Amino acid sequence: MVALVGVLPAMPAMAQNGAANGGANGAAAAGAVNLPPALQAAIQSGNPAAVSQAIATLSGGNSQRTAELATGVVAAAERILKTNPQAAVAIATVAVESVRTDAVSKGSPQQVTTVVTIAARIFVQPDVQRLAPEATANLASSAVQAASTTNNPTLVATIANQAVSAAEKVLAAAPAAAVQVATVAVQAVKEQPVTQGAPQQTLQVATTAARIIVNPEVQRLNPQAVASIAVATVQIASTPAVYQSSPQAAISVMDNSYKAASSQTVVAAAPTVVQTVTRELVQASQNGSLAQSNPTNSKEVSDILDRTNTVNRPPADQANNQNNQNNNNNNNNNNNNQNNNQPVVPPFTPAPTSPT
């Protein structure tokens, strides 16, 4: 448990705002200072469960009040980011979880936007990623899910992009958590309003996710998630609006996704994934809209399939040696068969000569 005593000093709201945030987040920072004493005490205890309970009790089930309190809590988390990054992540996660419901997002969409935006500023920090990689990944996943409730395509794509970028940064330390973030982010941007409303950021999410799933450790830990991401990222990259934002980046997504799907580890867990991804790639190679954005699209997509198939085939020398061995075996078998089929000739025995 992380002690937070003294993180909310008693000072005038405007002075606190200016010192901590330079005036950039006035409302959020002021809300952090004006938190009810019970909530301040919960934050200072360093107990995330106590913070969550305090929000629930003080809001009384009122979604707007929940959003207000969560905004203040996440602002308090950002305040202590430099001095206590681990505590900042824990507190911010509670705030984000509080606004993940549809009732809160519909009643207070602007405050939900503020909460997830501040949360993203926390989980992209290198110190947070280094000291608390799994907690950082969990915060990133929650922020994407909360953003998705707002039905704001730009917000969803922005938070998802930041989240999957953070996931890639913590990949070595927390591969299982990283692939979970990638799963959530890809599913969030796969929806049509997002692919159409924020195609460039959507493609960036797919690009980063595809890089994550080629990692062998990720494939070992969660091959089924890798298979799911591989299919989804190919579908995203082959969406005309997304593809045309950067055809070469889209081709790279397809390439990495197919490599991941073709991994023996992934195929063992999801036997149909190669067939599914192949079908998506074939459709992409025949898509006229993609060809308009990139005249060499068909060839480039076909090359992905050819390269992967070549990798899966034995080397030419090995194949030739195998063929030669097979031919030798066949020749030996034929010789044996011919020998077996020769008529048996009895040994020559000279006739006895008559005595004269």
Positions of predicted regions on the chain:
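Cleavable N-terminal signal peptides
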Residues: V2-A3, A13
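Short, low-complexity polar/charged micro-motifs in intrinsically disordered terminal tails
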Residues: G6, A351-P352
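Sec/Tat signal peptide C-region and signal peptidase I cleavage site
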Residues: P9-A15
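Non-catalytic all-alpha helical scaffold/repeat segments
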Residues: Q16-N334, Q338-P343, P347-F348
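Short, solvent-exposed mixed-charge patches
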Residues: N17, T353-T356
